[in-house]
Amino acid sequence: ELTYSEIDYANTSISGQIYDIIRICHVKGGLAIACGDAGIGKTKAIRKYASDYSTNTVVVTMNPCLTGVKSLLCTLAGRLGADRSHSIPDLWNAIVSKLTDGMVIIFDEAQHMTLKDIEILRSFSDYFNDMGQTLGIVFIGNPETVYKMGVKKAEFAQIANRTKQIKIYSTSEIQREDIEKLFPILEGHDKEIDLLWKIAKTHQGIRGTVN
């Protein structure tokens, strides 16, 4: 009898690509955007990366309550252990004092962010770039992330030009091999693997196969 236990991390095709995007941004600095349908392994990639590079990776998970520049900066300051001063300029300076060359900040659920948020965060990366240092900032969320940021608008062009990568993924890109990696216990059980692959390519994504 087969008994399934969830794997902590499987290097699936999409999750692996998102991991690589984070890595490139970490090494080169600047901004990167990776977004896609729910349940394709985005958060799994973030957790794996943060575990592998725990000393210089900061993860911030956004939500609808964290609206406005001050809320964003207060949240980031809290993650960095910086003083949450009352004014935005003081917050900015407090955050800079905690950031160091060679760090990467990953924003999960980035669809809750605005173009203004991105501009403020880019200023941190620019600050380090001007000193010949690197600070990578990665935005990860659903496809709305790109559209809400205004990727088709002229005012986004400057940010897009400064962005290392912008990638959008969908459940339709999930590979059969991904299911085999997630369910090694099903080796040789082609019918079951094909069924799970079919589920994974729906709106449920990979998450739908393990829940």
Language-model segment annotations:
Residues 27-48, 64-65:
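Walker A/P-loop nucleotide-binding motif
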Residues 36-38, 113, 128-155:
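Sensor-1/coupling segment of RecA-like P-loop NTPase cores
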Residues 68-86:
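Conserved NTP-binding/hydrolysis module of P-loop NTPases
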Residues 95-121, 125-128:
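Conserved P-loop NTPase "ATPase switch" module shared by AAA+ and STAND
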